């Protein structure tokens, strides 16, 4: 259950930034999490509310935006969206040139994108 450790870091970042801004309350936290990250959103939300209890972030809404996994062919530059858990990535070849040499463009992110305070 790595969601707990990740969420502890998120709450720490949120509280440090809210304290620096002299906030009275954190009302919303927006995360951007890539599809490649193996995160259970419900579990992360539950962990967030558990960890934030008793802090100025205890009533904050946690919003999680999933970032699609996009790969790019190193040979021709063609980009492709991969869907995880479909076996899509195991035998992927470029539809344009037929090669199978890719690198990740996006989908591995884990960002605290926005913190709303009052």
Q: Predicted regions span which residues?
A:
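Short hydrophobic/aromatic patches at helix-to-coil boundaries
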Residues: 114-118
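Long, charged N-terminal interaction/targeting segments
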Residues: 1-65
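Short, flexible, mixed-charge glycine/proline-rich loop motifs
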Residues: 61-69, 83-88
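Short functional micro-motifs and their immediate structural scaffolds
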Residues: 81-82, 102-103
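Short cysteine-rich clusters marking metal-coordination/redox-active sites
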Residues: 73-76, 94-97
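Cys/His-enriched microdomains
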Residues: 71, 89-92, 110
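Conserved beta-strand segments that form the floor/walls of ligand-binding pockets within enzyme
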Residues: 30-32, 93, 111
């Amino acid at each position: 259950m790595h969601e707990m450790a990740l969420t502890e870091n998120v709450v720490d970042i949120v509280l440090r930034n809210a304290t620096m801004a002299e906030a009275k309350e954190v009302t919303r936290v927006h995360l951007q999490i890539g599809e490649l990250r193996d995160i259970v959103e419900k579990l992360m939300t539950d962990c967030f509310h558990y960890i934030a209890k008793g802090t100025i972030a205890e009533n904050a809404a946690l919003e999680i935006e999933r970032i699609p996994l996009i790969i790019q062919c190193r040979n021709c530059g063609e980009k492709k969206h991969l869907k995880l858990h479909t076996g899509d990535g195991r035998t992927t070849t470029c539809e344009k040139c037929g090669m199978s040499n890719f690198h990740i463009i996006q989908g591995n992110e884990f960002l605290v994108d926005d913190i709303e305070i009052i």
